[in-house]
Each structure stands twice: as C-alpha cells, then as structure tokens.
A protein has these predicted regions:
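Solvent-exposed loop/turn elements at secondary-structure boundaries
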Residues: 1-74
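Residue-level signature of outer-membrane beta-barrel architecture
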Residues: 23, 92-94, 158-160
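Conserved small-residue
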Residues: 153, 157-186
Length: 186
C-alpha cells in the first residue's frame, strides 16, 4: 500500500462568518438568533489511482461501484464544501429564576466531499460514503455526516429549597429531537 501526498497540498482551512442578535425582552424573557456560514477553501480529498477502469457495476441509487483496489491512495485537496446554519433560542424564567424554560431550534445545510473523521488515509477513504467520482473529487459534494439538518432542544429547570436556601435542589428536564436516523446504510 502506497499513500502519496499532492505536492501542492497544504493544511485544510475554511472561511467562517457569524452574525448574532440577542434581545432582552420584558418579563424575564430573552430571544436570540444566529447565522453561521463556513466555506471550504481547502479540505482533504482522496484518489484511488487503481480504480480507474475497474468499474464493476452500478448501485441501485445510480452510483458506480468498483472492483477491489490495491490500497494505494493519493491525498489531494478540494475547495468544495460549505455549511450554512440558522439558530434561534428563547428563554423565560418565573418565580425569581426558580423556574426556567429554554427552547431552541437550528436549521443546518452542510455539504462536504470527504468526511475526514479518522486519522489515516485508508480509513478516511474507506469508511465514509463519498461522491460518485473517485478520480476528480473537486466535482461533487454530498450531505455532511457531521450535521443534523434540523435540531430542536428544550429544557425545563426548577430549583427548590427542600433542604434550605443554602442547599438548593434542582429538577431538570431535557428534550432533544434531531432530523435523520440513528444509523444509516451506504
């Protein structure tokens, strides 16, 4: 197995922008909105030079699959991939902050070429689903593995003085709902 590196390869980086507005409302209420944008300038991409010409067939979803490779990988880079997200949060408290409610929603659109969640070329290339172009990775992106497109969060927090004011007791409820499935098949 040979792992080669593009001679022009550099460390991955991206441009990021964030803008947030927070509003203190009346009656112990708070509202916030945030926008985040992340654009890839350089990210990992992998090419398996031994797959060229070794097309074995087509998968039911239209992607090409290849016969076994020799295990040689060439690491290069891509400028494709981006993340855009909006998030909203609301808090309200009652009874001198003894009862608190927190609600939040986020909407994220994230695309990347390779997930790059491992420490070696082979596992980054072989573990994660990729675009359907192993020879020209700069031509395609796919939904990212790392971001849930929608997320809802809620908490309810109550502080009681069951054992006196010096030893407060907290009751805490937490709720989370994310889009997607806990497992996927690729």
């Amino acid at each position: 197995d040979v792992n080669s590196l593009d001679p022009d390869f550099g460390l991955p980086f991206s441009d990021r922008f964030a803008l947030a507005f927070d509003f203190d409302l009346e009656d112990n209420m708070f509202f916030g909105v945030e926008y985040n944008k992340d654009s890839v300038d350089r990210a990992f991409a992998y090419i398996d030079p031994n797959l060229e010409g070794n097309v074995a067939g087509t998968l039911p979803d239209g992607r090409t699959y290849y016969s076994n490779s020799e295990g040689d990988l060439h690491t290069t880079f891509t400028d494709l991939g981006q993340t855009t997200s909006w998030s909203y949060k609301f808090t309200k408290s009652w009874f001198d902050n003894k009862l608190k409610l927190y609600l939040a929603y986020s909407d994220t659109e994230a695309e990347d070429v390779f997930a790059a969640g491992s420490s070696t070329q082979g596992s980054n290339y072989g573990k994660y689903a990729t675009c359907n172009n192993q020879f020209y990775p700069n031509l395609c992106t796919k939904p990212s593995l790392w971001g849930a497109s929608e997320r809802y969060v809620g908490t309810l927090d109550y502080t009681a003085d069951i054992f006196g004011a010096d030893n407060p007791t907290r009751f805490y409820l937490y709720w989370l709902r994310e889009s997607g499935r806990p497992f996927s098949f690729t």
